[in-house]
Amino acid sequence: MEEFKKYFERDSYWQQHFLYPLLFQEYIYALAHIHNHGLNGSIFYESGEVLGYDNKSSLILVKRLILRMYQQNFLIHSSNESHQNGFVGHKNPFFSQMISGGFAVIVEIPFSLPSLIEKKKKEITKSQNLRSIHSIFPFLVDQFSHLNYVSDILIPYPIHLEILIQIIQSWIQDVPSLHLLRFFLYEYHNWNSFITRKKSLSTFGKENPRFFWFLYNSYVSEYESVFCFLRKHSSYLLSTSYRNLIERTHFYGKIEHLPVVCSNDFHKNLQLFKDPCMHYVRYQGKAILASKGTSLLMKKWKWYLVNFWECNFSFWFQPYRIHINQLSNSSFLFWGYFSIVLINPLPVRSQMLGYSCLIDNTLTKKLETLVPIIPLIGSLSKAKFCNVSGHPASKPIWTDLSDSDIIDRFVRICRTLSHYHSGSSKKQSLYRMKYILRLSCARTLARKHKTTVRAFFQRLGSGFLEEFFTEEQKFLSLVLPRTSLASGSDRVYKERIWYLDIIRINDLVNYSRLAMELCTGNITKRIEKRSKIAFLFSTDMLKCSCSGS
């Protein structure tokens, strides 16, 4: 990385043509393998292992790939030649993984270097706790209790391939790399192996995680850059024609003349987006837009966003993907929690000159974060820890492991879910979840030793697997003051605790996300309108490009 920084600092002109030659360097593919291995395990070599490749022969394959890339010219390539010769790796999934992984590494260099150089100049130390998923919940607890409405937005996808390339072109000026990206995407689209209606994009995301997230983050950063600008300058937006605002070409040039246009031509229109208290949170494939304004203001934002995606990204965004809820009357889904603002009466005693009176008209708002038991049971059932009714079941696939390994796996799962849902206002769901995992572990061990669960507990005693229930108390006793634990474990389970070391969502929580959406009833209405809509963001990202290109 130090070598890259020196290269960039020498001459800024070479930044435009610096990326493409890196694609022919062997160490780029080694970096791609390391990053993919750390991101999702040994995903980079999954297809290679299926085809009979191993790590020893990977270096030979990389050299063979580079040699073929030297022989094939991506910049001048007719459609007839592409059908005759084909793109490098179109018959070899391992080659396609290497190309996409290497390309993802080199295109991230222009984004990472400025931040590193700027950080070195300013010497600003940033807390790593901000990466935690739980770091957003204290903000929601403090802010959302003062807000009135929230819009639950399902971020639209996919966009056309050419528009996606144009978005990346606004950030990367390396023309050969853009030609390679365009050729790579369109060739995969033509072979029906990269974008098809039969094969979901989730497979591509698993095999090429770094490249997949680069494409998605480029799209998200594009719309958020425009959206955040409009939010910051909302006091100047006086119901102007949005079609003049959201065109990508000369966008910032038009903004300079925006106040003049607004004052001269739009006196009769109402102010659209004047709201000093607006909060935006994005997570996975969804976003939340909360406001202290009125229902009319939220509806204006909804239709603006619908037209924004239609005009700026050239595809239809269904209005029912944005659902407006009043915080005091309905709940919204967020990172595996049901969140709702409850209005609680607060009695206040007033005393003056010996006389006292009780005033019970004071109302307080509090954001409650709840963990519904039905989606949790559904996720545990999908993982074969119980049935759909919540009755614990054994894990036959784990009976070949040792007793300590079986117990360690169950304890690890229980610890992960307990920590993730420790911010729940009511902990009854956690008690039941631990009960299911405890009995599932006992049934698995009993099945391994060919005995009954009752006989197993009688032999080991009632204290068997007690760590399922006592581990969190032991941990909190080391962190929290002794005074906070003086009243026992009941006091601990009534408090909401947010862990700032959780940087990824658990698979069981991910499984329960769809079930949680079905439980609310809001998503159920959307299913009745259009049953073929895709709920999970990672399954269908670039689907529209099949019909649009």
UniProtKB/Swiss-Prot annotation:
InterPro entries: Domain_X, Maturase_MatK, Maturase_MatK_N
Protein family per UniProt: Belongs to the intron maturase 2 family. MatK subfamily.
Protein name: Maturase K
Annotated localization: Plastid, Chloroplast
A Pfam match: Intron_maturas2
GO terms under biological process: mRNA processing; RNA splicing; tRNA processing
GO cellular component annotations of the record: chloroplast
Alphabetized PANTHER family for the sequence: MATURASE K
Function: Usually encoded in the trnK tRNA gene intron. Probably assists in splicing its own and other chloroplast group II introns.
Molecular function via GO: RNA binding
Swiss-Prot/TrEMBL keywords: Chloroplast, mRNA processing, Plastid, RNA-binding, tRNA processing
Domain of life: Eukaryota
